[in-house]
Curated annotation (Swiss-Prot):
One of the Pfam families matching this protein, by short name: TMEM95
Gene source species: Bos taurus (Bovine)
Originating gene: TMEM95
Listed name of the protein: Sperm-egg fusion protein TMEM95
Organ and tissue specificity: Detected in testis and brain with higher levels in brain than testis.
Main location: membrane
Length: 166
């Protein structure tokens, strides 16, 4: 239980994961320029950069950073900034939650994994989430064994009188 609390404290300290990788892409500077151009339409642009509820593993961090680079590049080329708020909301509400869960749940996480605190861009080892948290409603191996033993026992109990009757 204390490992879940430690994981929750760690996840609360995470911000703007997309800025930790590929410094040559200069995502924070590019996003700041786009936000300054969109100041009238989207007042909370720079506030939306913080992703305080997420932590990502190495592969997910690379995917999100590369995806954000490509989206910003398309916006810069086309000069169309109106899709920036919808991309940022999609990133926060859908993709980061998915990658965060993927990093902390089986099969990709076994025992513990390294997640990156994006406010410092340093990796920390955290324990994986239990299977019941990752897949609520699914049965774990112990419950499957109990169910299998119950079915076998019932079959034997019904089989013995059936054999005696025959």
């Amino acid at each position: 239980m204390w490992t879940l609390a430690l994981g929750g404290i760690f996840l609360a300290a995470v911000e703007a994961c997309v800025f930790c990788r590929f410094p040559d892409r200069e995502l924070s500077g590019r996003l700041a320029r786009l936000c300054s151009q969109m100041e009238v339409q989207w007042k909370d642009c720079e506030v939306s950069w913080t992703f305080s509820a997420f932590a990502l593993d190495d592969a997910s961090l690379n995917k999100i950073t590369e995806k954000t680079h490509r989206v910003l590049r398309v916006m810069e080329i086309k000069g169309s900034l109106y899709s920036l708020p919808s991309y940022w909301q999609w990133l926060r509400k859908t993709k980061l939650r998915e990658y965060n869960r993927e990093a902390l749940c089986p099969p990709s996480c076994r025992g513990s994994t390294i997640l990156y605190n994006c406010s410092t861009c340093q990796g920390f080892e955290v324990y994986c989430w239990p299977r019941k948290r990752c897949f609520p409603g699914s049965h774990d191996l112990w419950e499957a064994r109990i169910l299998l033993l119950f079915v076998c026992g019932t079959a034997l109990l019904l089989g013995v009188p059936s054999l005696a009757v025959e």
